[in-house]
Amino acid sequence: IVGSCLDNMQPQGFDKIKSISKNIYDICLEQKTQNMAITKIGGMLRTNKIKRIIFASVDKSPHCIQLHYIQDELRKMMNLSNIEIENYVVVNNELIKISSEVISLSKNLKELTNLKNKVGDKI
C-alpha cells in the first residue's frame, strides 16, 4: 500500500516496491481519510488471504506519514500476529526500512523532545 504520489515523486523507488510485490494499491491520505483506509484494509485482512503488507511513502509528508500509522489502528481491531508488516520511506529513490517502534515514536512529541535533549545537537 503506497502513497499515490510515490510513483511520480520517486519513480525508481516505486519500481523497487513493484519488484517486491505485484499487488500494489495506492491511496492519497490528503484526499481520503485514514479511517476510510483502515476500514478498507481491515476488510481485506479479514479474508485471511493476506500474509504480508508493505506500507511505503515519500518521506517528510504530513499526509503520507499517516499511511504508516494505519498498522497501529489495525492492531487495535484485530490480531495481526500472522501478518508480516513492513514500512518503507523512499528517499532519493532508495527504500529505507522503518521499524514500527520508530513509527510509534514519531507520534510522541514529548518522547522525541526527551531524546533530542539527551543527544543534544547530534540529530
Question: Where on the chain are the PLM-derived regions?
Answer:
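Iron-sulfur-associated redox domains of electron-transfer enzymes in respiratory
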Residues: 1-123
